[in-house]
Amino acid sequence: MNTEATHDQNEALTTGARLRNAREQLGLSQQAVAERLCLKVSTVRDIEEDKAPADLASTFLRGYIRSYARLVHIPEEELLPGLEKQAPLRAAKVAPMQSFSLGKRRKKRDGWLMTFTWLVLFVVIGLSGAWWWQDHKAQQEEITTMADQSSAELSSNSEQGQSVPLNTSTTTDPATTSTPPASVDTTATNTQTPAVTAPAPAVDPQQNAVVSPSQANVDTAATPAPTATITPDGAAPLPTDQAGVTTPAADPNALVMNFTADCWLEVTDATGKKLFSGMQRKDGNLNLTGQAPYKLKIGAPAAVQIQYQGKPVDLSRFIRTNQVARLTLNAEQSPAQ
């Protein structure tokens, strides 16, 4: 009867009360139990007061109670009914697991995106290279065309130069035909000399007998005339005094070019006249004058040094890009492309 009474009494007590009674019977304090179980004193107090901390999972709470029961020598089977009430098991909320296929699909999508990015990059690089090649090829073709034009102009100029002697030979005929009157004049002057030399001393009679008037004319015609310079009719003699000769003033719009390598060049003034168009060889130079502004087209800007109005012209922007230089030199020496 006493055993059944104690059993009923134990069932009437809660889990926390039974653990507290057992602890007091063993003479242990809450601090000692907390140190042995490696728990906080507040946790031991909550267990004895049958409280379930909100921040503590039921699984951990049931484990702490079992450890406390073993410490105070209480069978765990006797505490199971109370554990179900004090620390009921809660259904854990399981987060939905992500399917592996979703990650695989995302990875596949990332792969397609990366492939598309590389494809766009290759297309941009290819288009840039094609554009550069077309520009370079167009410049080379333009230089070749300009060189062909200059060679054609040079050949036409050479043909015209070969036909010039024919014209000069015909123009020299009047000069040759006009010389006899000059000789006639000299003979006329010579025929007048006897009258001038009449007061001279007498000559040997034998010499006068030998020389006839016709022979005298022949001798005087054979002797060179004292006046050797013949000028055309109506032309004034050129001055020989060097002090009177004045040098022309330097043109302020003069264009001076020095060449360090072979270069094709075309220079046009404001009137549209081509001052020069053709190839210039290495170590050559040009000094051109015309009406400003000048329009220049240079095949190799790095091969020429230009001075306009005594100042150098900057061609660095054309040299860096390695392209045909097209610029205009205004009167105030401001080159513009």
Curated annotation (Swiss-Prot):
InterPro entries in the cross-refs: Bact_Cytoskel_RodZ (IPR050400), Cro/C1-type_HTH (IPR001387), Lambda_DNA-bd_dom_sf (IPR010982), RodZ (IPR023690), RodZ-like_C (IPR025194)
Keywords recorded for this protein, A-Z: Cell inner membrane, Cell membrane, Cell shape, DNA-binding, Membrane, Signal-anchor, Transmembrane, Transmembrane helix
Compartments (UniProt record): Cell inner membrane
Transmembrane segments: 112-132
Cell inner membrane as UniProt keyword: yes
GO cellular component: a single term: plasma membrane
One Pfam assignment: HTH_25
UniProt membrane topology term: Single-pass type II membrane protein
Main location: membrane
PROSITE patterns in UniProt: HTH_CROC1 (PS50943)
Record topological domains on the Cytoplasmic side: 1-111
Comp. bias (Polar residues): 145-167, 208-218
Region (Disordered): 145-220
Biased composition (Low complexity): 168-207
One GO BP annotation of this record: regulation of cell shape
Segment forming the signal sequence: none
Domain of life: Bacteria
Molecular function per GO: DNA binding
Record's function text: Cytoskeletal protein that is involved in cell-shape control through regulation of the length of the long axis.
NCBIfam families xref list: PRK10856.1
Domain notes: The helix-turn-helix (HTH) motif in the cytoplasmic domain of the N-terminus is involved in the formation of spirals to maintain the rigid rod shape. As this protein is anchored in the cytoplasmic membrane, the HTH motif may contribute to protein-protein interactions to form the RodZ helix, which is localized beneath the cytoplasmic membrane. The C-terminal domain may be critical for determination of the rod shape by probably interacting with enzymes required for synthesis of the peptidoglycan layer, including PBPs in the periplasm.
Family: Belongs to the RodZ family.
HAMAP family named in the record: RodZ
Protein's UniProt name: Cytoskeleton protein RodZ
Organism: Escherichia coli O17:K52:H18 (strain UMN026 / ExPEC)
